[in-house]
């Protein structure tokens, strides 16, 4: 937070809204500004979302306060209106041509003030901000409206809402209404802030075509605890859904003289691909980037279809092909390519031009030799993190060279790694050649971002798709021809109907399959469609015209990227005129925020461009770097030790950090090797403590270096303590409630199993659990849970949890709150890091990353009475008929279990129960090693 300016007597408080409001300071009691009402109303009609955010604040202080309204909205959205109501007067935002607003913007910059109200934040969001002075006891109402067309990606439409009030709000309500005439096929919600107290505040109602999601927490539900006046709301609320569809010409919807045509047919066979991966391995890709690229590339290669052909080109100063020509994606070739990808090292310059021309030549030669399968699709996928530095370095020349070489025969997709990449260069390179560009954000999930992008283009269904409508029925149609349709995506065409057109709108959609052309026919009654969109009371009306304008502007702006210089101005003029006519804040317009006469009139809202990100000081991760920029002391570089990784010097954003455990020290930490029979992970023990040697200790017989002497004494004392102290109680790898028992449990460790293990499977439950056990760590290195209905994969590792559905993967860090509800499955994770996978009809499976002794993943089961009689697996076998042997005469703490004809020894032991999360509770259980 910036300090108050000396010339003003008022203090400053931020009110940050992210769809809901976000108050970025402390509570109202301290600052005087109180958000007493926050509402968001989002109405989605046929994928077009109209969102209104309203915040009402009051200044309860005795002095003037400055309130800053700040909210986040999706990058693809256009702001359409902003207003403030102060003392009964409405002060609207006025949308103007950007050049017209430039004078006000420049005047503000000349005064050293921040005039831009919108800036990029994070990956897919932009931040809107405006400030105003608030008199004592005065009330202000802020209202912001924006609109967007939800894009189908990997079979899902997604609406993202950030929830971060940072103070308790008396009236906090969020309503999302969805109306889809095609029918809603599934609906799911996910949040990263939900607690057990908040579950009842989120309600979902759904019928065939409508859905209503409401979030309305009470004051007590918002509190972290009854004793704290701080809010627990801090995270994302995500709504995902899809609609019913069939093999048809799509769905035509009509309202108020405009129409929209959605096309995403089901049941088409995926076309074979010819894929050339062009991978940057220049020096700037070293470290985490190249590591994640290798990881993603290996998994992408595994996803290739046997019908596909592929090759790899890696480049730095020079470009190199993995194989002389395209090779089939056979198991043998994929395994060899995986080995090659695993050995890619980063070094040298960036020769993009030669690498791209080599990729085109590779496809050309295969085409000339008739080695491309009939009806196949040829793709080039480029991954780079920087500007060209070797060979041809002029971006325009490279774009021209590639465009001439491709000549419209192949599709090029460009992935820009990080914020230093020239995104504008890559975007034009891709759009010139029938593809698209995507920024890969440098983060812990970069490999997943790469894999998800590949999944978007991995399954082409149709090529050369064209939409045709009767000339006497429509006018002003948006783009109606497309190069490729991919599985999980959707083509959208919108237009205006003729005033006296026919009563029925017909459409013909044609495209190419691998071996034949295909034509779809569809029609829609104008009168019936008009009536359908007028009937729902809670869906906003006259949206279709705005959808058409929104889509037209987006496409015109995209066309300017690859248009010639002569055509660019005409395209911009068309987009500008529509932006002004429909009050959209786009890259060509600005919104001037008006204020009372006694306040400065210098704030202007402009739409950021994706290509401008490299010039903006934006940090999408934590606020660590921002903290140091504000003058805080930077800690000295320090080191930490992990039982799993050993010594590690952790680099922070502005320096390094060190984690010391007072009084804990091992010989390895002092720079000496541990004993040869002690594995690396045992060199450090969290329970060891160094005792002070008594003053009467006998003198040494020689005079070694004092530092060495201290080390020797410490090591001797540590060894002595280890032999005298009982081994600490450990957490088992898996905790299994015994069938028919309410208290007794099995604590199971599969110590004698090697490689991936089928832990349990139940075909009637539709669940399977596999994992890999590491004997040295006495825990699992990974666990994967597969559900058949819904089809979901949950892969847990010590780093994070990855959830995959509809070929789309999302990563979640341990101990981050998660609450996801979909038909047939609920996933929850709290701050302890306990992940629960449950459903009223399913066994509950719990996963936990245990970072205590025996670091690794842990597994637990609940509601095991729901297992069917067909359950099996290393752990599942204990839910078949289990026979207990009689206690040994001399020791009732030992029993024998007979399961499926095999005997297992069970010992009564004290273990740590982690079913409620760390640090665990000591329990007595029957311990079994498998």
Swiss-Prot record:
Q: What positions does the record give for glycosylation?
A: 81, 207, 274, 517, 577, 719-720, 722
Q: Where is this region: O-glycosylated at three sites?
A: 719-725
Listed under GO biological process in this entry are: acute-phase response; hyaluronan metabolic process; response to cytokine
Ranges for domain VIT: 29-148
Disulfide bonding pattern of the chain = 747-925
Annotated region Proline-rich (PRR) potential bioactive peptide: where?
658-688
**The name this protein goes by in its record:** Inter-alpha-trypsin inhibitor heavy chain H4
SMART domains in the cross-refs: VIT, VWA
List residues of the VWFA domain: 272-432
A single Gene Ontology molecular function, please?
endopeptidase inhibitor activity
Additional record remark: Possible biomarker for acute ischemic stroke. Peptides derived from the proline-rich potentially active peptide (PRO_0000016542) may be biomarkers for a variety of disease states including breast cancer.
**What job does this protein perform?**
Type II acute-phase protein (APP) involved in inflammatory responses to trauma. May also play a role in liver development or regeneration.
